[in-house]
Amino acid sequence: MLDPKFLRNELAVTAERLATRGFILDVAHLTQLEEKRKSLQVATEELQASRNAISKSIGQAKARGEDVDAIMAQVGDLGAQLDAKKVELAAVLEEVNAIAMSMPNLPDESAPIGADETENVEVRRWGSPRSFDFPIKDHIDLGEGLNGLDFKSAVKITGSRFIVMKGQIARLNRALGQFMLDLHTTEHGYTEAYVPLLVNEASLLGTGQLPKFGEDLFHTKPATEEGQGLSLIPTAEVPLTNLVRDSIVDEDELPIKLTAHTACFRSEAGSYGKDTRGLIRQHQFDKVELVQLVKPEDSMAALEVLTGHAETVLQRLGLPYRTVVLCTGDMGFGSSKTYDIEVWLPGQNTYREISSCSNMKDFQARRMQARYRVKADNKPVLLHTLNGSGLAVGRTLVAILENYQNADGSVTVPEALRPYMGGLTQIG
């Protein structure tokens, strides 16, 4: 959520910067609402002051033995007018809030301006794609050939975009998650967390999935009088970041660095027809998430560090990748700047996203009222929040199967994973 003061004082600038994201802000309507809000606010305060002043005179009139019926009637009339103005003001504030909640974050000035993914900017590459002297198989053929990926059973049990893994491939998938967690906790300074896979609406509002992206979620329990609705998490970013919702942490606690390995659930409502085969786009998938909560002046540097943590996973696994900075038109709703890390997939002969690392600045923190107390003046200030995949486990599995395949259909286990595989060097 954007800063209301900045929005009011710099409306034209806000509209201009949001336009680079493809979001058209109705400046005229918002200006009209703001004028109406001011007018109603003044009227409400004046009516409140008048009613209070006249109410005080009732006791004085009674003390003098005067008839107070007329004054009581006047107070009642002012009260009715005040109630009516409060209703009007609440309606205007609700509309303004709805508009504010629908606005994406302002892009950082360092984010390249562009309309879509074709205008993203590559910033670096690591490793060189392997040259094969035999016909390349994709991860689907490799996994099925090794009796490790069972798409048919998943369709029978649940439906499309799910997977059953078996044997050493299931073990490799588990090893990947453990390897990532160990790397981030022992070398990168993150604290591991075990978090709920079901979250309430307040949590999804806090991180920005609601109200705009409700159709992308799996909702398991509707809201009732007894409690809020629950939804399966689309990413562990939601529960991890919400750990500081409605909180004020001490400055000495920062930065807070959290990681979790969870299943994630997405309806993929907007991706009909995309990646219909294989593990690239599943309704249920594993991911190791990285979250950092930092002081505002530290967040841009923290984004570079967090992105480096995700890249380190690929380097340790020997997987070629490139890192691109997203242009304004391709960034996620809550992001001010995002790096996508794309791993090389020989089966597709292209780089595919395996991690997205973003600086949300105070966009999520304002929604969540997540703050820290500055030691110098003891005042609470909004945190800056960052998140990134470190990494998407299923897509990393895809990359290993395809990059480490052998001519006979077997797959070499990357050296970094062998301790997690009981010393196994090859699958198949």
Curated annotation (Swiss-Prot):
Question: What NCBIfam families has UniProt attached to this entry?
Answer: serS (TIGR00414)
Where is this protein localized, as stated in its record? Cytoplasm
In which pathway does this enzyme or protein participate?
Answer: Aminoacyl-tRNA biosynthesis; selenocysteinyl-tRNA(Sec) biosynthesis; L-seryl-tRNA(Sec) from L-serine and tRNA(Sec): step 1/1
Q: Which reaction does it catalyse?
A: tRNA(Ser) + L-serine + ATP = L-seryl-tRNA(Ser) + AMP + diphosphate + H(+); tRNA(Sec) + L-serine + ATP = L-seryl-tRNA(Sec) + AMP + diphosphate + H(+)
Alphabetical UniProt keywords = Aminoacyl-tRNA synthetase, ATP-binding, Cytoplasm, Ligase, Nucleotide-binding, Protein biosynthesis
InterPro entries under this entry? aa-tRNA-synt_IIb, aa-tRNA-synth_II, aa-tRNA-synth_II/BPL/LPL, Ser-tRNA-ligase_type_1, Ser-tRNA-synth_1_N, SerRS_1_N_sf, SerRS_core, tRNA-bd_arm
> What is the organism lineage in this UniProt record?
Bacteria, Pseudomonadati, Pseudomonadota, Gammaproteobacteria, Alteromonadales
Hey, which family's this protein in? Belongs to the class-II aminoacyl-tRNA synthetase family. Type-1 seryl-tRNA synthetase subfamily.
Q: Which residues bind ATP?
A: R266, S267, E268, E353, I354, S355, S356
What does the record give as the function of this protein? Catalyzes the attachment of serine to tRNA(Ser). Is also able to aminoacylate tRNA(Sec) with serine, to form the misacylated tRNA L-seryl-tRNA(Sec), which will be further converted into selenocysteinyl-tRNA(Sec).
Q: What is this protein called?
A: Serine--tRNA ligase
Q: Does the keyword Cytoplasm apply?
A: yes
Instruction: Spell out the PROSITE patterns in the cross-references.
Output: AA_TRNA_LIGASE_II
State how it assembles. Answer: Homodimer. The tRNA molecule binds across the dimer.
Q: Which organism is it from?
A: Shewanella oneidensis (strain ATCC 700550 / JCM 31522 / CIP 106686 / LMG 19005 / NCIMB 14063 / MR-1)
